[in-house]
Regions:
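Asparagine-centered strand-capping/turn motif at beta-strand->loop junctions
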Residues: 171, 279, 781-784
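Active-site-adjacent "subsite" loops/lids of carbohydrate-active enzymes
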Residues: 491-566, 658
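Active-site-proximal substrate-binding groove within the catalytic cores of carbohydrate-active enzymes
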Residues: 206-215, 342-345, 363-413, 429-435, ...
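Bacterial N-terminal signal peptides
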Residues: 8-16
Length: 791
């Protein structure tokens, strides 16, 4: 183990003597400078260390987004650089030239900073061979205000695509800082580059410097590679190989061992790898990617459970790029991702076993790449993170979905309708039977006449739409009449939005489901003590919105038990719909009265829905969908509607109908070339999926768009959703509603409660597709001519 003690020089990274000095030390030498600030760095690996002090004040570029608000000075006596920024946006201080670098080099910025106000970050701008920026904030680390000087470190590993770097400091908002004793270090890592393990199915090699993994499937010769991306200031320097595993150790910017990573063969499946990531639970942590992103190749496509599911070809520059969290209905609704070859069907699936604090990131790096990014638990590492990656030789996206279905069954997430019926007794089973094939109809009944909902529903039934889920709250008598008509009666409910009662006289409406008694004591609290913001409500004066705040999930079950029990004693609902519960992200709460991690949030939301489904035997629905609630939730409104590609303001203009079709609807939302029924392949026999109430079957007046939604309903064997404004709207569109419903009704009824066992693209252009169900039902849809057929 090599140890270097550095007594940092009294030379600022910004204000130097006007020349470039290179002092090189190898082995166990001590490099000392005349200053009182001492920091010990331990790098326990075979390396050369090169300390670089350089550049006078005129060698630095100072930039601010707001002009004339960045002030600086230099004290030559104690060699302190002073900076003050008097604006709310950002500023930077960087060297005015890029530095040429080579693969395998490691660069470290170390500085001593007094920060009484604002924030300062050290990072590197990273450039490729064409001087394009790869990353504006490579290896970024950030300081928060504190009394006295703090150490700030930033470290990067130079990967193959990085050809130049530019060290810099950046800040945001009103900031005051004193910066001294800054050193730039170049470290040449001489560690062994590769470690490998092998069994009868797979050969696995890990680049121990970049932690990128190459897997060769020995059954078909397929090679799977990962990107070598920057590791956010972490160096992996030690590796050991056992019979079935590779163990890696990394060191942080102070040279302390912090991360233990492991890649090993799964004990039950030779074609599977287990990845694990360990740190001290209280280690300050933002995010970290392990393993690195997997690269797609020619003829591959990415498989992502964005709501029902999507695929993006390996070279699709318009694929979704960015992060999709695994703890929100507007991320990945099931915690996995995969890549498969559309010709051979070979590929892999990666299952995130700790989804509460994780995201999956997709980016273009010559081809589309995808991998996990582990998030902190309230700013700390918290607990070990695990992922399982399984390789297969055929089956494509169906094999990916079925491998996850097997995992969901093993961990208790997959609970079928038949199992739910057994748990809920005769009355609960009868209610679930009403859900099968039921059109989900929303109506706020605004025709101004003295008609009641049962009048409208009777007309819908008489027209031929014979199974209905109705979720608009009505009085006791109307609910009884609807029940007598065989309708599955439900009502909208929400346990997220709470409006400050002081604003009731300012907003355009007061929602019956707000909980004024929860304000302010039971509201979710941010780290800075502010309340978590929720739905914005229009002001009476039309001058914008006033936000609700979010109820802390831990407190929600208490309010739900009181409310639901009281209401059911008066109204015999058969169902209940919980808005936002499985759409909004799991939350952290920093209240001392009800602190909450995202794991606590998940457990509380599960309990909330179980009050309805298990305690009261009601058919239970929620918005968009996350699969951890499948055991206690029976339908999702929005699972069919791909979240990133809905029309603008789909959550607000729910009762409007549109002539113009936005481009994202055609290119993504209803594009059969990009959609996959992943949710149905996993959970068709457990839950019913609907379109979103602002993205329903009749959202657009264009009949071709309506037809296409009907086609997807038939192919996936899921019932439609309609918005009906009033009786006049029903009568003027009755034939179209009935045609739409009947285009899939027989299919959805026959397939109800069955497993979807297969989905195929029957033509290379993916316009003809086929699904098959466990009872033998086969559905074929030709999207090019809007033709539906089934056996």
């Amino acid at each position: 183990m090599k140890k270097i003690v550095i007594i940092f020089c009294c030379i600022s990274l910004f204000i130097f003597s006007g020349c470039v000095n290179l002092q090189k030390s190898t082995t166990n030498g001590e490099v000392s400078f005349n200053d009182s600030f001492t920091e010990e760095l331990t790098f326990p690996f075979n390396a050369d260390y090169q300390q670089i002090d350089f550049f006078s004040p005129d060698k630095w570029d100072l930039w601010s987004r707001t002009e004339n608000k960045l002030f600086h000075d230099f004290s030559s006596e104690d060699e302190i650089f002073f900076v003050e920024y008097k604006a709310l946006d950002d500023f930077s201080i960087s060297i005015n030239n890029e530095m040429n670098v080579s693969e395998g080099e490691i660069y470290l910025i170390a500085s001593n900073i007094f920060l009484p106000k604002g924030n300062i970050s050290a990072n590197f701008i990273l450039y490729d061979e064409n001087d394009n920026v790869i990353d504006w904030v490579g290896g970024i680390t950030t300081l928060s205000p504190a009394n006295g000087y703090q150490s700030l470190y930033c470290l990067i590993y130079v990967t193959s695509e990085i050809k130049k770097i530019r060290p810099r400091f950046i800040g945001e908002g009103n900031t005051i800082a004193k910066i001294k004793n800054t050193v730039l270090y170049k470290i040449e890592n001489k560690q062994k580059k590769n470690s490998c393990i092998e069994n009868d199915f797979l050969k696995v090699c890990c680049d121990t410097q970049t932690i990128s993994v190459t897997v060769t499937d020995k059954r078909n010769g397929q090679v799977y590679e990962q990107c070598s991306e920057n590791l956010k200031g972490i160096i992996f320097t030690e590796s050991s190989v056992l019979e079935n595993e590779i163990q890696l150790t990394s060191y942080d910017k102070k040279g302390k061992p912090i991360i233990k990573s492991m890649i090993k063969f799964n004990s039950e499946n030779q074609a599977s790898l287990d990845y694990s990531l360990s740190m001290p639970p209280d280690y300050t942590f933002d995010s970290f990617s392990f393993p690195q992103k997997s690269m797609s190749k020619e003829n591959d496509y990415l498989v992502l459970p964005i709501n029902e599911g999507m695929c993006f070809d390996y070279n699709d520059e318009h694929a979704f790029h960015g992060e999709l969290v695994t703890y929100s209905g507007h991320g990945l609704c099931m915690p996995f991702y995969g890549i498969t070859n559309q010709i051979t069907g070979a590929g892999f699936v990666s299952i995130i076993k700790n989804p509460d604090d994780c995201a999956v990131e997709i980016k273009m790096n010559k081809t589309n790449c995808v991998g996990p990014n582990w998030k902190s638990q309230k700013g700390k590492f918290g607990y070990d993170r695990n992922m399982i990656q399984t390789f297969f030789t055929d089956g494509g996206h169906v094999a990916i979905a079925k491998e996850y279905r097997k995992y969901a069954k093993e961990n208790g997430t997959l609970v079928t309708f038949e199992e739910k019926k057994q748990k809920r007794g005769i009355e609960g089973a009868e209610r679930l039977n009403k859900l099968m094939g039921a059109a989900n109809i929303w109506c706020w009944y605004s025709d101004g006449k003295n008609h009641t909902a049962d009048t409208l529903v009777s007309q819908i039934l008489e027209a031929g739409i014979d199974r209905i889920l109705w979720s608009n709250n009505q009085n006791k008598e109307v609910i009884s009449k609807l029940n007598d008509l065989g309708v599955l009666t439900s009502r909208y409910d929400i346990y997220q939005d709470v409006m400050n009662p002081a604003y009731y006289n300012l907003v355009s409406y007061i929602h019956e489901d707000w909980l004024p008694q929860a304000y302010p004591n039971d509201i979710a609290t941010n780290k800075d003590g502010s309340f978590v913001q929720a739905w914005g409500v229009e002001r009476k004066d039309n001058k914008g919105y006033i936000n609700c705040v979010a109820l802390c999930d831990i407190t929600a079950p208490y309010y739900a038990r009181q409310k639901i029990q009281t209401e059911l004693s008066m109204k015999n609902f058969g169902s209940r719909f919980f808005d936002t519960t499985t759409a909004s992200s799991l939350r952290e709460c920093y209240s001392s009265a009800h602190p909450m991690t995202r794991t606590d949030s998940r457990k509380s939301r599960f309990e909330l829905l179980s009050i309805s489904s298990l305690e009261h035997k009601l058919v239970t629905g929620s918005e968009t969908g996350m699969d951890f609630v499948v055991p206690v939730c029976d339908y999702f409104e929005g699972m069919m509607s791909l979240g990133p590609y809905r029309r603008e303001d789909a959550g607000r203009d729910v009762d409007k109908f549109f002539d113009n079709v936005p481009s994202q609807i055609l290119e993504y939302q209803l594009n059969e070339k990009r959609r996959l029924p992943l949710w149905e392949l996993v959970y068709h026999d457990c839950c019913v999926a609907y379109w979103y109430w602002g993205d329903h079957n009749n959202t657009f007046n264009d009949q071709l768009i309506w037809d296409k939604r009907d086609n997807f309903n038939a192919l996936y064997a899921v019932p439609p959703m309609y918005w009906i404004k009033n009786e006049e709207h029903l009568q003027s569109n009755k034939e179209r509603f009935v045609k739409s419903y009947k285009s899939s009704a027989e299919i959805t009824k026959k397939a109800a409660g069955t497993e979807m066992i297969s989905h195929k693209f029957l033509t290379p252009d993916r316009t003809i597709q086929q699904t098959q169900f466990s009872n033998g039902l086969t559905v074929t849809v030709d999207f090019s001519i809007n033709q539906i057929s089934f056996n």
